[in-house]
């Protein structure tokens, strides 16, 4: 028997909403057809409400004396062994010796995304240039059903609410907010909740050189939990 896909839901929202085009809304409900995008797609999109060239990144600055910076950087890398393998140790030591401020930009690997919102707002929907909205009446069962359809492409999924904040900040061991749910402050009206599927790839100091392609999946089971709001 196949192992069921893993899907973690942090908050069980009573309802979620998907802004879309009318033609796609009909396909979701009538055919169970869903388009699952990717994080790196948003880096290439120029649409005001959608595109973000810094999607999936998070920056850290290391302050203090060279000894303090070296200690904090060591802690930083211990929790990110994949990053340690990708950085140039000699260049780092030279920067510390020259008293040059140290910073890293962390890139999460490309991931599959299905973006929704926990609060319906028709004005925001129009900002997305959408003319339809799907109400997801049971987000937990919807997410589990869609995750089943995504099983061939990604083994693990989670539902997370986006946090609208600055991507760059001083290093702090408690500053563990994942890069894949950070969005700029000017988009906080979106109130986005993401379904994220990961294929357990590494975190990078540069962009993922093997980006994913969007998927079209079928799930009439997921469609059962959708109804047309607009």
Annotate each PLM feature:
Residues 1-230:
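NAD-dependent ADP-ribosyltransferases
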